[in-house]
Amino acid sequence: MAVAGVGIISAIGNNVRECLSALENGQAGMDDIAWLDTVYRRKIPVAEVKASNSRLEELAGVGQHIDGPAGGRAGLVSRTALLSLIAAREALDNAAIPELDHWRTGIVSANTVGGMDRTEAFFSRGPRGRLRQVVQHECGYSTEWVADRLGIRHYQTTISTACSSSANAIGFGAKLIRHGILDVVVAGGTDALTKFTLNGFNALMILDSAWCKPFDGERQGLNLGEGAGYLVLVSDAVAATLSARSECVLSGYANANDAYHQTASSPDGRGSWLAMKTALERSGLQPADIDYINLHGTGTQNNDLAEGTAIRRLFEPRYPKMSSTKSFTGHTLGASGGIEAVFSVLAVWHGFVYPNLRFHTPMPELPFVPEIEFIRDVPIRHVMSNSFGFGGNCSSLVFSKCQS
């Protein structure tokens, strides 16, 4: 399945170019809370997109009056939907598919919070809240709104499986093309920070009060983030019409579940291992073929040990280069699989390996460590991207360089 285009917005940049620059220069996106109205300002670091909602409306190209299913006036569209539109539009522009209207085009978008930021604003105003804000609450709303803005008419659906949501959206999008249902799919996900997510993760006591350090022996937890990331997947027939040949394909995908706990990974990493193993089998590869792993790597004690244990079981004795880009973007929840898929495709396209920021102390339980420097011109053939969510929902994607 060819990847024709990518689009992204995150705490380290409003587009692909800005995000790549931050990755190359080791510029993380964590900071004090600026836009979310919460009692935790100046107490808990997060990785917010560096733009107000009004600025996001400008970037998304929405006017004073919002057309489409949202209706109403500017200022009422959820942050989740705005982030989604910005990244999805960049992905389509990047793909530059000639005569897109001639192809069966769909969108598979993921998120976990929907328009909850607007719902929270509604309830904060008591009886003065505007009911239109609540209409955007459910997860499918942002997908519908973005599809309308982009003129996508053939197919739209929403996936919400916690932190593996976007990876599952990409895998499902590929299936739609493989089975001849669609020719082009915009696949990925989006999520905005909300009080609900910040309060919930704080209640679980897995937030780091400093900037997170995934896969470090002294890690203390994760930093929440927000953003959106999308790929444009195309059939062979569409790929043949592109002026520039796609240099990357989605060669494998798998979803598994360890059925262990609602908010924790199994200590033996069984779900993670099964997802990675099956994705490799479906791509026709061996563990030794993987050149780089974009780790799920949240920075929590449980997640990193479970993922690391699964990697040791599957890859020993030869471990590929690996790192967690959540050390840049924070954990963007439903958007993380999409954002990290974009980074994985860029790694295949350009031969990049990203650093695992703030890593100092190896985990004593693991025989490997992540990369700590940005590496250029690496002969990358295959990249694995891991996304492991609450409820034991584990997904792995494999991206491969096209054979000449």
Describe the function of each predicted region:
Residues 1-3, 10, 74-90, 99-101:
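N-terminal amphipathic, basic-rich helices that act as targeting or association modules
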Residues 1-4, 27-32, 40-44, 207, ...:
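Condensing-enzyme catalytic core mediating Claisen C-C bond formation in acyl metabolism
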Residues 1-70, 237-249, 342-356, 400-404:
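ACP-dependent fatty acid/polyketide chain-elongation machinery
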Residues 5, 23, 88, 107, ...:
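Conserved small-residue
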Residues 94-108, 124-131, 144-155, 178-185, ...:
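Structural signature of cysteine-dependent C-C bond-forming condensing enzymes
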Residues 42-47, 118, 192-214, 255-274, ...:
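Active-site-adjacent elements of ketosynthase-type condensing enzymes
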Residues 30-86, 104, 112-172, 181, ...:
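Conserved catalytic cysteine-centered active-site region
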Residues 11, 112-113, 162, 298-300, ...:
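Glycine-rich phosphate/pyrophosphate-binding beta-alpha loops
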